Swiss-Prot record:
The lineage of its organism: Bacteria, Bacillati, Mycoplasmatota, Mollicutes, Entomoplasmatales. It comes from Mesoplasma florum (strain ATCC 33453 / NBRC 100688 / NCTC 11704 / L1). SUPFAM superfamilies: Ribosomal protein L13 (SSF52161). The keyword Ribonucleoprotein applies. GO terms for cellular component: cytosolic large ribosomal subunit. Part of the 50S ribosomal subunit. This is Large ribosomal subunit protein uL13. GO terms for biological process: negative regulation of translation; translation. Keywords: Ribonucleoprotein, Ribosomal protein. Pfam families: Ribosomal_L13 (PF00572).
């Protein structure tokens, strides 16, 4: 009988990837990025270890929503004080801080525990093309858009 081999924490190699969010659908992009942050794309994926990679997302302000979500979708936040419910539409959030749209979408797809918080720290979202991680030599990732595989 074969025994499952587990990778040691010292042997985990973290790769860096860069993704251009321009013209990408929020949900489809978020699921792929969350998969990479968790490490599920690797052969040696282990659920109880953080062996995910770093992901840099550029052009976060150019991400797309389908339908009328730009005006109809509402983000809620409560300050935990009476009358403290705050609402923002996607259009308002995009003007204030476009990176929060993708960060929130991806964070909610990660585990809700210490490991999920550590995996979320490997996400780096930026408005525009510039980012400070050129020294890591990130590998460019492209995802097949729906309808492009014909």
């Amino acid at each position: 009988m074969k025994q499952t081999t587990l990778i040691a924490a010292k042997d985990i190699k973290k790769n860096w990837y860069i993704v251009d969010a321009a013209g990408q659908n929020v949900g489809r992009l978020s699921t792929e990025v969350a998969r990479i942050l968790r490490g599920k794309h690797k052969v040696d994926f282990t659920p109880h270890m953080n062996n995910g990679d770093h992901v840099i997302i550029i052009n976060a302000e150019k991400v797309l929503f389908t339908g009328k979500k730009e005006s109809d979708k509402t983000y809620y936040h409560h300050s935990m004080h009476p009358g403290g419910l705050r609402r923002r539409t996607v259009a308002v959030q995009r003007e204030l801080d476009a990176t929060k749209i993708l960060e929130r979408s991806i964070r909610l797809m990660l585990p809700k525990n210490v490991q999920g918080r550590n995996q979320f720290r490997a996400l780096h979202v930026f408005v525009g093309e510039n980012h400070p991680y050129a020294a890591q030599k990130p590998e460019v990732l492209t995802f097949v858009k729906k309808g492009d595989n014909k």
